[in-house]
Amino acid sequence: ASMRGGANFAAFASAKNGLRALAQSMARELGPKNIHVAHVIIDAAVDTEWIKSINPEYDKKIKTDGIVNPSHLAENYLYLYDQPRDAWTFELDLRPWQETW
């Protein structure tokens, strides 16, 4: 939502875009102090009990990698953490391979 608004999501999209702008400002302010700030976009359902309970297509999506495994998200956050300063990522966009965008 921080990168693209959707119909009926005006409030959510504007808030997410504000979060992105905040992350950009923090990255510029804190980068010179050796603090890595990254904006991570997770455009997906994450495999939790709550998602399992509300998603009628859960079984189908989990079998086809349509729902993100929390461990795989954690691997991406470790990737950000371990980056050398000369190649910091500011924005990381995570989504299942079959997500339409």
Question: For each predicted feature, which ranges?
Answer:
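A short small-residue
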Residues: 1-5, 53-59
